[in-house]
Structure formats: structure tokens, C-alpha cells
């Protein structure tokens, strides 16, 4: 059965991006089903208006509750999944959240706009997710990478589970360096260990590189890692070379 994702947005055409590349192929194979729905279609306003001035004054406009709530209720008829709002007050999205959500069978995402949504909509929302401490033009900009990162973890989307298990963040570390042909480029050679054909040595080298890159570039992540005996030994051995 396909993982079903419904996206509520004012700009459904932005999600045509999912019809291409890896996600597009997964949709064609029936592994994923992603549909975007225009919130404006649910507006009872004769001009299909979906925003209004905030009570109490202030800059900008706020999305009105009626179209959003009605669209959620409509989708809930055939989608019993969590309702997730992309907003700045949510918990920061990361790989662990992606892994958790990739196990769901159905999900509904809401993309906000303007100065946000009417507070009374939140009782219909199960979870709020943020990409980080910065402001985007609209929730669509956040929804695309969130949905992409979730979908690629769904079994069958990638050709092999190893494709994502060795990527940055999946195991709490940043990814090791990658090399391809030519063997020498602008005087810089591919590390000899990668040409050796010795799989265990290659594994150890990659693990060491992941550890050192994470320690240097993301010390906050490195502090959360419980180093194994092998990790400690690798750091000791390679640091002497």
C-alpha cells in the first residue's frame, strides 16, 4: 500500500517538483501518493478570499480559519494521518523526525502564508514543524524538503537501504568524503585506502572521517554520540598518521 501524503496550500503547482527524479519514480511505482490541494477552493467567500486583517491591529494579514478547517475535515474522510503544520513555532525538523514520520501510512501537511494562521485552527493540528530559526516566504518552502526527506526513507523509494543509512545525519554523523573518477584531479589523488579493495579498511577509514568531520563541523552533534571502543581506537590510530 502506498504512503499517502496530502498537502494543503495556496500554491499547489509548487509541488509538481515531486513528479520528477526519485520521488516521481516512486509515485509511478505506486510506493508513494502525493497530492496538493488548494485551500482557496474551500473558501466560502465569494471572492475565494482566505486572509483578513488581524484583530488588535498589526502588520500583514492572517489566514482565516474556515477554509483551512474545512479542507482538513474534507481530507480526513480519506486520510486518517497526522495533521502537520509548517510554522516557526514548531520543533526543529531533523533526521530523527523524518525517520519517525516515514513509518506513517498517511500524513496531511498544511502550508501557512502571510503572518500565519488563525489560532483557532491549531486544535485540528497534531504537530508543528519548523526548518529552523529563520523566516520563509511561505510554508511551501519548508514543506518540500520535509516531505522529500520523509519519502526517501520509505522502503522501496531508494534502490537500497544502504543509500540512506550511510548518509549524513542518518546515524548521527556527517557523511564521509566521496570520490569518483578521475583518480587524480588537479594534482590531488583519491586516498589509497579507497583503491585498495580492502572492505574493512575502507569501512574503518570512512567511519574515522565521519567522526572527525562531525567533530570539526558540528561539535554539537559530536557531543551527542556515544563512541564505541572501535571509534576511540580509530581516532587514536588515524590521528597519528
UniProtKB/Swiss-Prot annotation:
**A GO CC annotation given for this chain:** cytosol
UniProt keywords (A-Z) are: Cytoplasm, Methyltransferase, S-adenosyl-L-methionine, Transferase, tRNA processing
The EC code for this enzyme is 2.1.1.228
The EC class name is transferase
Q: Which SUPFAM superfamilies match?
A: alpha/beta knot (SSF75217)
Which terms under GO biological process does the entry name? tRNA N1-guanine methylation
Catalytic activity, reaction form = guanosine(37) in tRNA + S-adenosyl-L-methionine = N(1)-methylguanosine(37) in tRNA + S-adenosyl-L-homocysteine + H(+)
- What subcellular compartments does it reside in? Cytoplasm
Q: Which GO terms describe its molecular function?
A: tRNA (guanine(37)-N1)-methyltransferase activity
Q: Enumerate the residues binding S-adenosyl-L-methionine.
A: 112, 131-136
What the record says about family reads: Belongs to the RNA methyltransferase TrmD family.
The annotated subunit structure for this chain is:
Homodimer.
The protein's matches in HAMAP family, at most eight in alphabetical order, are given as: TrmD (MF_00605)
NCBIfam families found in the cross-reference section: PRK00026.1 (NF000648), trmD (TIGR00088)
Report what the protein is called.
Answer: tRNA (guanine-N(1)-)-methyltransferase
Question: What is the protein's species of origin?
Answer: Clostridium novyi (strain NT)
User: What lineage is this protein's organism placed in?
Assistant: Bacteria, Bacillati, Bacillota, Clostridia, Eubacteriales
Amino acid at each position: 500500500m502506498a504512503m499517502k501524503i496530502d498537502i494543503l496550500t495556496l500554491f499547489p503547482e509548487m509541488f509538481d517538483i515531486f513528479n520528477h527524479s526519485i520521488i516521481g519514480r516512486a509515485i509511478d511505482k505506486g510506493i508513494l501518493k502525493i497530492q496538493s490541494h488548494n485551500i482557496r477552493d474551500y473558501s466560502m467567500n465569494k471572492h475565494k478570499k482566505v486572509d483578513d486583517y488581524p484583530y488588535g491591529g498589526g502588520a500583514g494579514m492572517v489566514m482565516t480559519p474556515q477554509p483551512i478547517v474545512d479542507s482538513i475535515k474534507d481530507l480526513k474522510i480519506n486520510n486518517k494521518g497526522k495533521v502537520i503544520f509548517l510554522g516557526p513555532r514548531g520543533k526543529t525538523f531533523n533526521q530523527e523526525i523524518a525517520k519517525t514520520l516515514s513509518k506513517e501510512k498517511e500524513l496531511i501537511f498544511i502550508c501557512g502564508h502571510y503572518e500565519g494562521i488563525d489560532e483557532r485552527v491549531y486544535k485540528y493540528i497534531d504537530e508543528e514543524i519548523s526548518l529552523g530559526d529563520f523566516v520563509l516566504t511561505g510554508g511551501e518552502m519548508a514543506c518540500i524538503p520535509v516531505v522529500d526527506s520523509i519519502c526517501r526513507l520509505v522502503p522501496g523509494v531508494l534502490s537500497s537501504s544502504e543509500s540512506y543509512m550511510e548518509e549524513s545525519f542518518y546515524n548521527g554523523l556527517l557523511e564521509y568524503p566521496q570520490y569518483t573518477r578521475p583518480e587524480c584531479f588537479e594534482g590531488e589523488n583519491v586516498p589509497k585506502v579507497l583503491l585498495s579493495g580492502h572492505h574493512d579498511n575502507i569501512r574503518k577509514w570512512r567511519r574515522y572521517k565521519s567522526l572527525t568531520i562531525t567533530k570539526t563541523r558540528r561539535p554539537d552533534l559530536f557531543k551527542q554520540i556515544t563512541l564505541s571502543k572501535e571509534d576511540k581506537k580509530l581516532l587514536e590510530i588515524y590521528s597519528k598518521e
